[in-house]
UniProtKB/Swiss-Prot annotation:
SUPFAM superfamilies: S13-like H2TH domain. GO terms for cellular component: cytosol; small ribosomal subunit. Residues 94-118 are annotated as: Disordered. Part of the 30S ribosomal subunit. Forms a loose heterodimer with protein S19. Forms two bridges to the 50S subunit in the 70S ribosome. This is Small ribosomal subunit protein uS13. Belongs to the universal ribosomal protein uS13 family. PROSITE patterns: RIBOSOMAL_S13_1, RIBOSOMAL_S13_2. It holds the Pfam family Ribosomal_S13. GO terms for molecular function: rRNA binding; structural constituent of ribosome; tRNA binding. InterPro entries: Rbsml_uS13_C, Ribosomal_uS13, Ribosomal_uS13-like_H2TH, Ribosomal_uS13_bac-type, Ribosomal_uS13_CS. It comes from Stenotrophomonas maltophilia (strain R551-3). The keyword Repeat does not apply.
């Protein structure tokens, strides 16, 4: 089992799929990382040699991933809330930010229904 960016990658999966278990790396970026590192994306993670893992580690290290990315996103949201702009207010109230209707939908963002008391 390879460990990259503090994440244990699943050994039985292809490299490009396994890299997606790292927060901040999706399909496109995982394929790009494999290509630049010179690793076949369809190789299973258990079959990687140590130099290949090191090359992947170095390539993933060029991106902001995992805790650093989560922290950056949190800081950006906090900044919006401190500014008091529209998006910040919507974050503060737990409502959708991008103009979706809220009269009937938006249950994911608003959470479970609250009982109406009479």
């Amino acid at each position: 089992m390879a460990r990259i960016a503090g994440v244990n990658l699943p050994a039985q999966k292809h490299v490009w799929v396994g890299l997606q278990s790292i927060y901040g790396i999706g399909r496109t970026r995982s394929k790009k990382v494999c290509e630049v590192a010179g690793v076949a994306s369809t190789t299973k993670i258990r079959d990687l040699s140590e130099p290949e893992i090191e090359r992947l580690r170095a390539e993933v290290g060029k991106y902001i991933v995992e805790g650093d990315l989560r922290r950056e996103i949190g800081i950006a949201i906090k900044r919006l809330m401190d500014l008091g702009c529209y998006r910040g207010l919507r974050h503060r109230r737990g409502l959708p930010l991008r103009g979706q209707r809220t009269r009937t939908n938006a249950r994911t963002r608003k959470g479970p229904r609250k009982a109406i008391r009479k």
